[in-house]
From Swiss-Prot:
One of its GO terms (biological process) is signal transduction. Secreted scaffold protein that plays an essential role in dorsoventral patterning during early development. Stabilizes axial formation by restricting chordin (CHRD) activity on the dorsal side. Acts by facilitating the association between the tolloid proteases and their substrate chordin (CHRD), leading to enhance chordin (CHRD) degradation. It comes from Gallus gallus (Chicken). It comes from the Eukaryota. Glycans are attached at N175, N235. Residues 1-21 form the signal peptide. SMART domains: OLF. It is found in: Secreted. This is Olfactomedin-like protein 3. Belongs to the OLFML3 family.
Length: 392
Protein backbone atom coordinates (compact mmCIF):
# COMPACT_ATOMS: atom_id res chain seq x y z
CA UNK A 1 0.00 0.00 0.00
CA UNK A 2 1.34 3.34 -0.93
CA UNK A 3 1.80 6.24 1.42
CA UNK A 4 -0.89 8.23 -0.17
CA UNK A 5 -3.47 5.50 0.54
CA UNK A 6 -2.55 5.50 4.26
CA UNK A 7 -3.17 9.19 4.37
CA UNK A 8 -6.66 8.67 2.95
CA UNK A 9 -7.58 6.01 5.57
CA UNK A 10 -6.56 8.09 8.59
CA UNK A 11 -9.69 10.39 8.53
CA UNK A 12 -11.96 7.36 8.19
CA UNK A 13 -10.35 5.63 11.18
CA UNK A 14 -10.74 8.80 13.28
CA UNK A 15 -14.44 9.25 12.32
CA UNK A 16 -15.46 5.70 13.44
CA UNK A 17 -15.11 6.32 17.26
CA UNK A 18 -16.99 9.60 16.97
CA UNK A 19 -19.97 7.84 15.36
CA UNK A 20 -20.09 5.20 18.13
CA UNK A 21 -19.89 7.89 20.79
CA UNK A 22 -22.77 9.75 19.18
CA UNK A 23 -24.92 6.62 19.13
CA UNK A 24 -24.14 5.95 22.80
CA UNK A 25 -25.14 9.49 23.77
CA UNK A 26 -28.39 9.18 21.85
CA UNK A 27 -29.11 5.90 23.64
CA UNK A 28 -28.46 7.46 27.04
CA UNK A 29 -30.68 10.41 26.20
CA UNK A 30 -33.51 8.08 25.19
CA UNK A 31 -33.18 6.14 28.45
CA UNK A 32 -33.15 9.33 30.50
CA UNK A 33 -36.20 10.60 28.66
CA UNK A 34 -38.02 7.33 29.38
CA UNK A 35 -37.00 7.51 33.05
CA UNK A 36 -38.20 11.09 33.31
CA UNK A 37 -41.51 10.06 31.77
CA UNK A 38 -41.94 7.29 34.32
CA UNK A 39 -41.03 9.63 37.17
CA UNK A 40 -43.64 12.07 35.92
CA UNK A 41 -46.23 9.25 35.80
CA UNK A 42 -45.31 8.25 39.37
CA UNK A 43 -45.73 11.83 40.54
CA UNK A 44 -49.13 12.02 38.84
CA UNK A 45 -50.27 8.73 40.40
CA UNK A 46 -48.93 9.73 43.82
CA UNK A 47 -50.75 13.03 43.64
CA UNK A 48 -53.96 11.27 42.59
CA UNK A 49 -53.66 8.72 45.40
CA UNK A 50 -53.01 11.50 47.92
CA UNK A 51 -56.09 13.32 46.70
CA UNK A 52 -58.22 10.15 46.90
CA UNK A 53 -56.88 9.38 50.39
CA UNK A 54 -57.65 12.90 51.55
CA UNK A 55 -61.15 12.67 50.11
CA UNK A 56 -61.69 9.27 51.76
CA UNK A 57 -60.44 10.62 55.08
CA UNK A 58 -62.81 13.56 54.86
CA UNK A 59 -65.65 11.18 53.98
CA UNK A 60 -64.87 8.93 56.97
CA UNK A 61 -64.67 11.93 59.29
CA UNK A 62 -68.04 13.07 58.04
CA UNK A 63 -69.51 9.61 58.61
CA UNK A 64 -68.03 9.50 62.13
CA UNK A 65 -69.52 12.89 62.93
CA UNK A 66 -72.89 11.71 61.65
CA UNK A 67 -72.63 8.48 63.66
CA UNK A 68 -71.71 10.43 66.80
CA UNK A 69 -74.71 12.70 66.33
CA UNK A 70 -76.98 9.68 65.79
CA UNK A 71 -75.51 8.01 68.89
CA UNK A 72 -76.18 11.11 70.96
CA UNK A 73 -79.70 11.24 69.59
CA UNK A 74 -80.26 7.55 70.44
CA UNK A 75 -78.87 8.04 73.93
CA UNK A 76 -81.16 11.00 74.45
CA UNK A 77 -84.11 8.91 73.24
CA UNK A 78 -83.09 6.05 75.56
CA UNK A 79 -82.83 8.41 78.52
CA UNK A 80 -86.21 9.83 77.66
CA UNK A 81 -87.69 6.33 77.39
CA UNK A 82 -86.15 5.36 80.75
CA UNK A 83 -87.61 8.47 82.34
CA UNK A 84 -91.02 7.66 80.87
CA UNK A 85 -90.78 4.06 82.14
CA UNK A 86 -89.85 5.29 85.63
CA UNK A 87 -92.74 7.72 85.58
CA UNK A 88 -95.07 4.94 84.39
CA UNK A 89 -93.88 2.64 87.19
CA UNK A 90 -94.51 5.39 89.74
CA UNK A 91 -97.99 5.88 88.32
CA UNK A 92 -98.61 2.12 88.45
CA UNK A 93 -97.39 2.06 92.05
CA UNK A 94 -99.74 4.90 92.86
CA UNK A 95 -102.68 3.15 91.20
CA UNK A 96 -101.85 -0.09 92.99
CA UNK A 97 -101.76 1.82 96.27
CA UNK A 98 -105.08 3.50 95.55
CA UNK A 99 -106.70 0.30 94.25
CA UNK A 100 -104.91 -2.61 95.93
CA UNK A 101 -105.40 -6.12 94.68
CA UNK A 102 -107.37 -8.39 96.97
CA UNK A 103 -105.25 -10.49 99.32
CA UNK A 104 -104.19 -13.83 97.91
CA UNK A 105 -106.54 -15.73 100.23
CA UNK A 106 -109.27 -18.09 99.14
CA UNK A 107 -112.63 -17.05 100.55
CA UNK A 108 -115.01 -19.83 101.43
CA UNK A 109 -117.98 -18.72 103.55
CA UNK A 110 -118.73 -22.22 104.81
CA UNK A 111 -115.09 -22.75 105.68
CA UNK A 112 -114.97 -19.38 107.44
CA UNK A 113 -118.03 -20.29 109.52
CA UNK A 114 -116.45 -23.60 110.47
CA UNK A 115 -113.20 -21.89 111.35
CA UNK A 116 -115.04 -19.31 113.43
CA UNK A 117 -116.90 -22.02 115.34
CA UNK A 118 -113.72 -23.99 115.83
CA UNK A 119 -111.88 -20.89 116.98
CA UNK A 120 -114.46 -20.30 119.73
CA UNK A 121 -113.91 -23.83 120.99
CA UNK A 122 -110.12 -23.67 120.74
CA UNK A 123 -109.23 -20.24 122.08
CA UNK A 124 -106.53 -21.78 124.24
CA UNK A 125 -104.57 -22.57 121.05
CA UNK A 126 -103.98 -18.92 120.31
CA UNK A 127 -100.30 -18.21 120.77
CA UNK A 128 -99.86 -16.28 124.02
CA UNK A 129 -96.07 -16.13 124.33
CA UNK A 130 -95.68 -13.10 122.10
CA UNK A 131 -93.83 -10.01 123.24
CA UNK A 132 -95.15 -6.48 122.94
CA UNK A 133 -93.91 -6.21 119.33
CA UNK A 134 -96.81 -4.83 117.30
CA UNK A 135 -95.14 -3.63 114.10
CA UNK A 136 -95.90 -4.66 110.56
CA UNK A 137 -94.48 -3.72 107.17
CA UNK A 138 -95.93 -0.59 105.60
CA UNK A 139 -93.74 -0.43 102.48
CA UNK A 140 -90.28 -1.04 101.05
CA UNK A 141 -88.39 2.15 101.88
CA UNK A 142 -85.24 1.48 99.85
CA UNK A 143 -83.45 -1.19 97.83
CA UNK A 144 -79.68 -1.67 97.61
CA UNK A 145 -78.04 -4.10 95.18
CA UNK A 146 -74.74 -5.21 96.71
CA UNK A 147 -73.18 -7.36 93.98
CA UNK A 148 -73.54 -10.55 91.96
CA UNK A 149 -72.06 -13.62 93.58
CA UNK A 150 -72.38 -17.34 92.98
CA UNK A 151 -75.30 -19.28 91.55
CA UNK A 152 -78.71 -18.01 90.48
CA UNK A 153 -80.18 -19.42 93.72
CA UNK A 154 -78.71 -19.12 97.18
CA UNK A 155 -78.92 -17.48 100.58
CA UNK A 156 -77.06 -14.71 102.41
CA UNK A 157 -77.74 -13.38 105.87
CA UNK A 158 -76.43 -12.04 109.16
CA UNK A 159 -76.95 -13.43 112.65
CA UNK A 160 -80.61 -12.60 113.28
CA UNK A 161 -80.20 -12.53 117.08
CA UNK A 162 -76.67 -11.20 117.58
CA UNK A 163 -74.68 -8.04 117.02
CA UNK A 164 -72.06 -9.64 114.78
CA UNK A 165 -71.40 -8.03 111.41
CA UNK A 166 -70.39 -11.31 109.79
CA UNK A 167 -72.01 -12.30 106.51
CA UNK A 168 -72.99 -15.94 105.95
CA UNK A 169 -73.44 -17.18 102.38
CA UNK A 170 -74.96 -20.45 101.12
CA UNK A 171 -74.22 -20.69 97.39
CA UNK A 172 -76.67 -22.88 95.47
CA UNK A 173 -79.47 -25.13 96.69
CA UNK A 174 -77.49 -28.15 97.92
CA UNK A 175 -73.95 -28.24 99.32
CA UNK A 176 -71.94 -28.78 102.48
CA UNK A 177 -69.95 -25.53 102.60
CA UNK A 178 -70.77 -22.13 104.12
CA UNK A 179 -68.83 -18.93 103.30
CA UNK A 180 -68.26 -16.50 106.17
CA UNK A 181 -67.15 -12.91 105.56
CA UNK A 182 -65.99 -10.76 108.50
CA UNK A 183 -67.92 -7.67 107.38
CA UNK A 184 -70.05 -6.37 104.55
CA UNK A 185 -67.05 -4.56 103.07
CA UNK A 186 -65.14 -7.79 102.47
CA UNK A 187 -68.18 -9.38 100.90
CA UNK A 188 -68.64 -6.56 98.40
CA UNK A 189 -65.06 -6.83 97.09
CA UNK A 190 -64.57 -8.18 93.57
CA UNK A 191 -62.56 -11.24 94.68
CA UNK A 192 -64.83 -11.90 97.63
CA UNK A 193 -64.15 -15.61 98.06
CA UNK A 194 -60.49 -14.91 98.88
CA UNK A 195 -61.57 -12.92 101.94
CA UNK A 196 -64.01 -15.59 103.15
CA UNK A 197 -63.57 -18.35 105.68
CA UNK A 198 -65.14 -21.65 104.71
CA UNK A 199 -66.85 -24.10 107.01
CA UNK A 200 -67.43 -27.61 105.76
CA UNK A 201 -70.49 -28.91 107.58
CA UNK A 202 -70.68 -32.51 108.84
CA UNK A 203 -73.95 -33.03 106.94
CA UNK A 204 -74.90 -31.42 103.60
CA UNK A 205 -77.65 -28.83 103.51
CA UNK A 206 -80.56 -28.66 101.06
CA UNK A 207 -82.70 -25.71 99.95
CA UNK A 208 -82.33 -22.05 100.90
CA UNK A 209 -84.23 -22.00 104.19
CA UNK A 210 -81.31 -21.93 106.63
CA UNK A 211 -80.73 -19.44 109.43
CA UNK A 212 -78.02 -18.04 111.71
CA UNK A 213 -79.43 -17.27 115.15
CA UNK A 214 -77.59 -16.45 118.36
CA UNK A 215 -74.24 -17.84 117.22
CA UNK A 216 -75.74 -21.09 115.93
CA UNK A 217 -76.41 -22.21 112.40
CA UNK A 218 -79.80 -23.87 111.97
CA UNK A 219 -79.93 -25.70 108.67
CA UNK A 220 -82.02 -28.32 106.88
CA UNK A 221 -80.72 -31.78 106.13
CA UNK A 222 -82.56 -34.33 104.03
CA UNK A 223 -81.88 -37.98 104.76
CA UNK A 224 -85.24 -39.68 104.49
CA UNK A 225 -87.28 -37.29 106.67
CA UNK A 226 -86.14 -33.71 106.92
CA UNK A 227 -83.97 -32.80 109.89
CA UNK A 228 -83.18 -29.48 111.54
CA UNK A 229 -79.49 -29.39 112.48
CA UNK A 230 -78.20 -27.00 115.16
CA UNK A 231 -74.52 -26.25 114.52
CA UNK A 232 -72.29 -24.26 116.88
CA UNK A 233 -70.35 -21.78 114.74
CA UNK A 234 -67.81 -21.10 117.51
CA UNK A 235 -66.51 -24.63 118.07
CA UNK A 236 -67.82 -26.04 114.77
CA UNK A 237 -69.76 -28.96 116.21
CA UNK A 238 -73.32 -30.24 115.95
CA UNK A 239 -75.01 -29.61 119.30
CA UNK A 240 -78.49 -30.90 118.47
CA UNK A 241 -80.70 -32.25 115.69
CA UNK A 242 -84.36 -33.02 115.33
CA UNK A 243 -86.58 -34.73 112.78
CA UNK A 244 -89.16 -32.19 111.66
CA UNK A 245 -92.55 -33.55 112.80
CA UNK A 246 -94.46 -33.21 109.53
CA UNK A 247 -95.40 -36.07 107.25
CA UNK A 248 -95.29 -36.08 103.44
CA UNK A 249 -93.68 -32.70 103.07
CA UNK A 250 -93.78 -30.86 99.76
CA UNK A 251 -91.97 -27.69 98.59
CA UNK A 252 -93.26 -24.81 100.66
CA UNK A 253 -93.13 -22.26 97.81
CA UNK A 254 -94.57 -22.94 94.38
CA UNK A 255 -91.89 -20.87 92.61
CA UNK A 256 -88.98 -22.19 94.73
CA UNK A 257 -89.30 -26.00 94.52
CA UNK A 258 -85.88 -26.58 96.12
CA UNK A 259 -86.99 -25.38 99.60
CA UNK A 260 -89.07 -27.67 101.81
CA UNK A 261 -88.55 -25.92 105.15
CA UNK A 262 -87.91 -22.19 105.53
CA UNK A 263 -86.43 -21.26 108.91
CA UNK A 264 -87.14 -17.67 109.93
CA UNK A 265 -86.41 -15.41 112.86
CA UNK A 266 -88.14 -12.29 114.12
CA UNK A 267 -88.60 -10.33 117.33
CA UNK A 268 -90.39 -13.35 118.84
CA UNK A 269 -87.81 -16.04 118.12
CA UNK A 270 -87.46 -18.95 115.73
CA UNK A 271 -90.06 -20.16 113.20
CA UNK A 272 -90.41 -22.87 110.57
CA UNK A 273 -92.41 -22.38 107.38
CA UNK A 274 -93.36 -25.59 105.56
CA UNK A 275 -96.07 -27.44 103.61
CA UNK A 276 -97.53 -30.96 103.55
CA UNK A 277 -99.67 -33.03 101.21
CA UNK A 278 -102.44 -33.02 103.79
CA UNK A 279 -102.89 -29.29 103.24
CA UNK A 280 -101.09 -29.00 99.92
CA UNK A 281 -102.70 -25.77 98.77
CA UNK A 282 -101.63 -23.61 101.71
CA UNK A 283 -98.51 -22.84 103.70
CA UNK A 284 -98.05 -24.02 107.29
CA UNK A 285 -96.24 -22.28 110.14
CA UNK A 286 -94.61 -23.61 113.31
CA UNK A 287 -92.98 -21.96 116.34
CA UNK A 288 -89.64 -23.56 117.29
CA UNK A 289 -87.76 -23.58 120.56
CA UNK A 290 -84.23 -22.50 119.54
CA UNK A 291 -82.67 -24.38 122.47
CA UNK A 292 -84.32 -27.79 122.17
CA UNK A 293 -85.68 -27.59 118.59
CA UNK A 294 -89.08 -28.66 119.95
CA UNK A 295 -92.23 -27.50 118.17
CA UNK A 296 -94.19 -25.16 120.45
CA UNK A 297 -97.21 -24.72 118.20
CA UNK A 298 -98.31 -25.21 114.58
CA UNK A 299 -100.75 -23.35 112.33
CA UNK A 300 -102.43 -23.95 108.98
CA UNK A 301 -102.33 -20.52 107.35
CA UNK A 302 -104.67 -19.23 104.61
CA UNK A 303 -101.67 -18.27 102.44
CA UNK A 304 -101.51 -20.30 99.19
CA UNK A 305 -98.37 -22.07 98.00
CA UNK A 306 -99.13 -21.32 94.36
CA UNK A 307 -96.90 -18.57 92.94
CA UNK A 308 -95.24 -18.06 96.34
CA UNK A 309 -91.49 -17.45 96.05
CA UNK A 310 -90.44 -16.69 99.63
CA UNK A 311 -91.60 -15.75 103.11
CA UNK A 312 -90.42 -14.26 106.39
CA UNK A 313 -91.89 -13.46 109.80
CA UNK A 314 -92.19 -10.00 111.38
CA UNK A 315 -93.50 -9.57 114.94
CA UNK A 316 -95.25 -12.93 114.89
CA UNK A 317 -96.86 -12.39 111.48
CA UNK A 318 -96.01 -14.52 108.45
CA UNK A 319 -95.43 -12.45 105.30
CA UNK A 320 -95.54 -14.40 102.01
CA UNK A 321 -94.09 -12.91 98.82
CA UNK A 322 -95.68 -13.84 95.49
CA UNK A 323 -94.54 -13.52 91.89
CA UNK A 324 -95.37 -15.07 88.49
CA UNK A 325 -93.83 -17.87 86.46
CA UNK A 326 -92.37 -15.22 84.17
CA UNK A 327 -90.65 -13.08 86.84
CA UNK A 328 -92.37 -9.78 87.49
CA UNK A 329 -92.70 -7.56 90.57
CA UNK A 330 -92.74 -9.45 93.85
CA UNK A 331 -95.34 -8.47 96.41
CA UNK A 332 -96.32 -9.44 99.94
CA UNK A 333 -99.89 -10.44 99.27
CA UNK A 334 -100.71 -12.66 102.22
CA UNK A 335 -100.07 -11.98 105.92
CA UNK A 336 -100.96 -14.38 108.74
CA UNK A 337 -100.67 -13.01 112.28
CA UNK A 338 -100.56 -15.74 114.96
CA UNK A 339 -101.82 -13.26 117.57
CA UNK A 340 -104.94 -12.51 115.55
CA UNK A 341 -104.31 -8.76 115.78
CA UNK A 342 -103.89 -8.30 112.04
CA UNK A 343 -106.52 -10.04 109.86
CA UNK A 344 -105.11 -11.19 106.49
CA UNK A 345 -107.58 -9.14 104.48
CA UNK A 346 -106.57 -5.93 106.28
CA UNK A 347 -102.81 -6.23 105.75
CA UNK A 348 -101.03 -3.77 103.49
CA UNK A 349 -100.16 -4.90 99.98
CA UNK A 350 -96.39 -4.37 99.81
CA UNK A 351 -94.65 -4.28 96.42
CA UNK A 352 -90.92 -4.81 95.96
CA UNK A 353 -89.05 -2.81 93.28
CA UNK A 354 -88.64 -4.56 89.94
CA UNK A 355 -85.34 -6.44 89.75
CA UNK A 356 -83.69 -9.19 87.69
CA UNK A 357 -85.70 -12.37 88.24
CA UNK A 358 -87.32 -13.91 91.31
CA UNK A 359 -86.25 -14.36 94.92
CA UNK A 360 -84.75 -17.69 95.93
CA UNK A 361 -84.45 -16.58 99.57
CA UNK A 362 -85.63 -13.70 101.78
CA UNK A 363 -84.21 -13.31 105.30
CA UNK A 364 -85.61 -10.71 107.69
CA UNK A 365 -83.26 -9.12 110.22
CA UNK A 366 -85.26 -7.98 113.28
CA UNK A 367 -82.29 -5.95 114.54
CA UNK A 368 -81.90 -3.95 111.32
CA UNK A 369 -85.51 -4.05 110.10
CA UNK A 370 -84.42 -5.09 106.62
CA UNK A 371 -84.59 -8.15 104.37
CA UNK A 372 -81.56 -9.87 102.83
CA UNK A 373 -82.65 -11.30 99.47
CA UNK A 374 -81.01 -13.42 96.75
CA UNK A 375 -82.35 -12.56 93.30
CA UNK A 376 -80.99 -14.49 90.30
CA UNK A 377 -77.44 -14.34 91.68
CA UNK A 378 -77.71 -10.73 92.91
CA UNK A 379 -77.53 -9.98 96.63
CA UNK A 380 -80.06 -7.30 97.58
CA UNK A 381 -81.00 -5.47 100.79
CA UNK A 382 -84.57 -4.19 101.24
CA UNK A 383 -85.03 -1.58 103.97
CA UNK A 384 -88.54 -1.72 105.38
CA UNK A 385 -90.86 1.05 106.51
CA UNK A 386 -92.76 -0.17 109.56
CA UNK A 387 -95.99 0.88 111.27
CA UNK A 388 -98.19 -0.41 114.04
CA UNK A 389 -100.63 -3.20 113.28
CA UNK A 390 -103.51 -1.18 114.68
CA UNK A 391 -102.83 1.55 112.10
CA UNK A 392 -103.33 -0.79 109.15
Amino acid sequence: MGPWRCLLLLPLLAAAPRAQQQQFMEYVERRLALLEERIAQWHDQSSRYSTELRDFKNQVLGMLETAEKEREALRAEAEGAAARVDRLEREVDYLETQNPAPPCVEVDEVLMEKQAATAKQRKNEKYTKLTDCSDTIASVRAMKILKRFGSSAGLWTKDAAGSSEKIYVFDGTANDTVYIFPRMREFTLFSATRRAARIKLPYPWVGTGHLVYGGYLYYIRQQGPFQVIKFDLANKTVVDSSVFPAEEQIPVFGLSPFTYIELAADEEGLWAIYATKENEKNICLAKLDPDSLDIEQMWDTPCPRENAEGAFVVCGALHVAYNTRLPSRSRVQCVFDVSGTLPPEEASLVYFPKRYGSHSSMKYSPRERQVYAWDDGYQIIYRMEMKKKLEV
